[in-house]
Design a protein with these regions (language model features):
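N-terminal signal peptide c-region/cleavage motif recognized by signal peptidases
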Residues: 17-19
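An N-terminal hydrophobic leader/cap segment in hydrolases
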Residues: 21-46, 55
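Active-site loop/oxyanion-hole signature of alpha/beta-hydrolase fold enzymes
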Residues: 45-51, 58-64, 93, 103-141, ...
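Conserved HGGG/HGGXW glycine-rich cap/lid loop of the alpha/beta-hydrolase fold
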Residues: 49, 53, 58-108, 319, ...
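Flexible "cap/lid" loop of the alpha/beta hydrolase fold
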Residues: 151, 155, 164-195
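Conserved alpha/beta-hydrolase catalytic His-Asp/Glu region
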Residues: 195-256
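Conserved serine/cysteine hydrolase catalytic core
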Residues: 229-295, 300
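Catalytic active-site module of serine/aspartate enzymes centered on a nucleophile-bearing elbow/loop
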Residues: 292-335
């Protein structure tokens, strides 16, 4: 009897694990052709650096009483516009039109060869997309790498950004100045080629969720892994290496005192994200990614900044605790 029960339990466990296993091996294509976005994708087609490009984006109308405002959502390096799924719903219900693009080199947008990536270039591309849509002012909300891009957008196009929200942005410290060794693109590319579902999940569990994991996070891991799981993975890996180098060598923090836009910092205090810390000496690595302190320092540097801390949350508070996060976001935007 005990053997039969054990066998049934094992079978049940295997059955439950099959969807995750299958999802972890799914190839969605280098531009996520096979991944289902929460809203229809539009495509902004343009030429940049002599090459034809397309930026995919979601353009979601307000479902609540329209307030005449537009929210621009900028994804992080290990995220896509789709990861903003619940935030899009909340903002739309609050009356916002929501624009959520995938940046060039990421997710469902072009994966160009020979492209010179910079935050200024990505900000320009995004501004041009908004211009095409007839949008002249936005509340800019950037998460992780998207926070660095949001800051650059606010600096380069101050007339465009009426509000700035930085959600656990990376780049609140200058890693190279702190003593993290430089890694060239060829090194980063070789590391990117090893990316798969398990490596993405392990990284996110350690740095984003403080060792915890919920089954609903698997979808976002599978989304990223799906770009590496089939044909085209080399182009994906190369663009990811290029943008890793961009993040490391193009700090925005030194310009924070020049940000004139009213700014809201939403900071999960358990976040320890610090790109390059794995190659830094121990004495350097251990002081990096101290987000409670980094958040306070950033709030002091930006002239019109307000800090809201989530002491028990990590790198992705909008995913980890959506109700708490979105309550703070909406309250902050309405001030």
């Amino acid at each position: 009897m005990k053997t039969a029960v054990s066998a049934l339990a094992l079978a049940a466990g295997l059955t439950l694990s099959l969807p995750v296993l299958a999802e972890s091996r799914t190839s969605y294509g280098p531009q996520l052709e096979g991944f289902s976005y929460p809203h229809p994708l539009k495509h902004y087609r343009f030429e940049s650096q002599g090459k034809p490009m397309q930026m995919a984006y979601m353009d979601v109308a307000p479902t609540g009483q329209a307030n005449g405002r537009t929210a621009l959502l900028l994804h992080g390096k290990n995220f896509c516009g789709a990861t903003w799924e619940r935030t899009i719903e909340v903002l739309s219900e609050a009356g916002y039109r929501v624009i959520a693009p995938d940046q060039v080199g990421f997710c469902s947008s072009s994966k160009p060869e020979g492209y010179q990536f910079s935050f200024a270039q990505l900000a320009h591309n995004t501004q041009a997309l908004l211009q095409q849509e007839g949008i002249d002012q936005v509340s800019v909300i950037g998460h992780s790498m998207g926070g660095m891009l949001a800051a650059r957008l606010a600096l380069n196009y101050p007339q465009l950004a009426e509000q700035l929200v930085l959600v656990n942005p990376i780049g609140l410290e200058d890693w190279q100045a702190e003593g993290v060794p430089y890694a060239h693109i060829d090194q980063l590319y070789q590391a990117e080629l090893k990316t798969d579902f398990d490596s993405i999940k392990a990284y996110q569990q350690k740095f984003y969720y403080n060792g915890n994991w919920k089954p609903e996070y698997d979808r976002w891991v599978a989304m990223l892994a799906g770009m590496y799981a089939g044909e085209g993975k080399e182009r994906v890996a190369w663009n990811q290496a290029q943008t890793s180098e961009m993040v490391f060598t193009q700090p925005v923090i030194h310009e924070f005192p020049r940000i004139s836009t009213p700014t809201l910092l939403l900071i999960g205090g358990l976040d320890r994200t610090a790109p390059g810390a794995n190659r830094a000496p121990d004495e350097v690595a251990k002081r990096l990614g101290n987000y409670p302190e980094l958040g306070r320092q950033a709030a002091a540097m930006i002239p019109q900044a307000r800090l809201v801390a989530f002491p028990d949350l990590g790198h992705s508070p909008q995913v980890e605790a959506p109700e708490e996060f979105h309550r703070a976001l909406i309250e902050g935007l309405q001030r």
